[in-house]
Amino acid sequence: MEKSIKIGFIGLGAMGKPMAINLLKEGVTVYAFDLMEANVAAVVAQGAQACENNQKVAAASDIIFTSLPNAGIVETVMNGPGGVLSACKAGTVIVDMSSVSPSSTLKMAKVAAEKGIDYVDAPVSGGTKGAEAGTLTIMVGASEAVFEKIQPVLSVIGKDIYHVGDTGAGDAVKIVNNLLLGCNMASLAEALVLGVKCGLKPETMQEIIGKSSGRSYAMEAKMEKFIMSGDFAGGFAMDLQHKDLGLALEAGKEGNVPLPMTAMATQIFEGGRAMGLGREDMSAVIKVWEQMTGVSVSGGQ
């Protein structure tokens, strides 16, 4: 990666901050902005240049990364009052790493193209640990030429980098992946409660299913660490999983694709959020079934 390149980073939360820090470790200039002053201070301490608003970041940068909570915020940051697109010079590349719908990305890409700006979707998988270690999986939607331009920068913050297609394709892959994760997690919770109701021990199911056709990433990643321990702090928040299922339903509606299993999983996670579990790991959805049935699985009981 060329050290002379100027990077902008907007959105320095749990994911954005470690990604920006990894870029700084490579010796490039990073212009940073976040509404939370503490987040900006954390990257300034690592050598970043603080900017007072989004436009200042845009005007100073060759490539601008954004990592934001949802599509509404992304669109406001890009095209609202004082937005990024009003201050970018032609030839700038914007790389949005947020989890949003392909339709939102395509809308922003169209506006950007009218100004001579390339707009890329590059959602990630790997969580905060992957962001800190620089080992994220990155799913990129962009033209071949733009992908080649940004790939050296992406390689600093990610390990497995996939050019999956044109603009919007990265968001689509992320949505499909998280649809499967959500449905698998809801099914796992349901199955474990049934097993305990039938007299099985959680440990027995974990061992046997883990070696059988019913095994899944949801079981491998969530069973021992969260469900068996009964500690659901940290991890991938239920609120975020619920949001991603909503994005899948939105894409299905736009494409006339029925998604009945996704709709049901969404309602199950909604039940968990109604119980106040939104900030716990998504595997806390098992508490919905425990409450309905009077069966205890979590905590190895």
Swiss-Prot record:
Its EC number is 1.1.1.291. It is an enzyme of class 1 (oxidoreductase). Homotetramer. Keywords: NAD, Oxidoreductase. Gene3D superfamilies: N-(1-d-carboxylethyl)-l-norvaline Dehydrogenase, domain 2, NAD(P)-binding Rossmann-like Domain. The gene is Hgd. Catalyzes the conversion of 2-formylglutarate to (S)-2-hydroxymethylglutarate. Has very low activity with (S)-3-hydroxyisobutyrate. GO terms for molecular function: 2-hydroxymethylglutarate dehydrogenase activity; NAD binding; NADP binding. NAD(+) binds at residues 8-22, 99, 243. It catalyses: (S)-2-hydroxymethylglutarate + NAD(+) = 2-formylglutarate + NADH + H(+). This is 2-(hydroxymethyl)glutarate dehydrogenase. GO terms for biological process: nicotinate catabolic process. PROSITE patterns: 3_HYDROXYISOBUT_DH. InterPro entries: 3-OH-isobutyrate_DH-rel_CS, 6-PGluconate_DH-like_C_sf, 6PGD_dom2, 6PGDH_NADP-bd, HIBADH-like_NADP-bd, HIBADH-related, NAD(P)-bd_dom_sf. Belongs to the HIBADH-related family. It comes from Eubacterium barkeri. Pathway: Cofactor degradation; nicotinate degradation; propanoate and pyruvate from 6-hydroxynicotinate: step 3/8. The active site is at 174.
